[in-house]
Every structure is written in structure tokens, then in C-alpha cells.
Amino acid sequence: ASLLAGATPEDVKHGLSTFRGAKRRFEVILDGKGGTTALLDDYAHSPNEVRASIRSVKKLYPGRKVSVIFQPHLYTRTKDFAKEFAEALSEADQVIMPEIYPARELPIPGVDSMLILKDVTSSSKCYCERKDLLNLIKNSNFDILMTLGAADIDRLLPDIKKIIMGGGPE
């Protein structure tokens, strides 16, 4: 397609060699080489996408403990797919979940992150308000840490990266 649009073969080769992928789609922030903590981010916001992301990270880092911070997006999606989200998230070794990101929706009585988290079967799981996530991360050790969700969890990535690399948030 690029050649038909007028690009030269050299342009295509250069473009492919420097393409880093789509932002927030299995984006590697820290690669975890040499046994260091890996940090990844994915926009996954449906149960199938969450499951696929967790399975992919387990294949990329076999034998390593996968911790996931999943920020639910929308009350209606949480209500409609709570069981499916719990099943998908249960494939991670550890699940951390902040409150639902409401976007355009008003709260629905009885619908919160615990609707999903209560059915997660991972050996380690916890609810953590978004405002407290950086402190939780600072006081924890992670092998592989992945943020998931369509909301604004990715805005914490620069500070999470600094914490993992031995610094602190700005």
C-alpha cells in the first residue's frame, strides 16, 4: 500500500524498522531484561482483550509473576461483564483494582470495582483507590507489572516508571 501511495522501498523499510506499534496496545514501557521489573500497558477494556493481554505477557515472560492493575471503564460495562472480567483477570498472579472510571456515566447503585474483584481467584488481589496507587507501588515489589483499561490509568505511567527505576513520582 505504501508503494502504491508513492513511497520508495527505502522509505517503507525505514518506516517498518522504526515503527514502535500503537500507543497503549501492549506497549512495553520497561522491558524487564536481566530480571528487572517489566512495565507494560494495554488499552484492554473487554474481558477477551484483558485475557489476551495477560496470556501474551505470560508468553513473553515465562515463569515470571504477572501483576495487573485493571481500571474498570464504565459502570454499565462493569455491571454487564463483571463475571467475565473476573475470569479473565484471574489468569494474572496478582490483581490490583482502583475505582471505576465513569467517563460519561453516572454511578449505578451496587456497581463498583468489588463486583469484579470479589470473584477474582488470583492468589493476591486488592482494591486500591487510584489516589493511593503510587504509594502501593512504591511499597511493593513487582516482577511484571501491567496496567490495563480504557480509562486514564496510563497517566500514572511516568510516575510508575520512576518508582520502578528507583526514583519517586514527581
How would you label these PLM feature ranges?
Residues 1-170:
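ATP-dependent carboxylate-amine ligase
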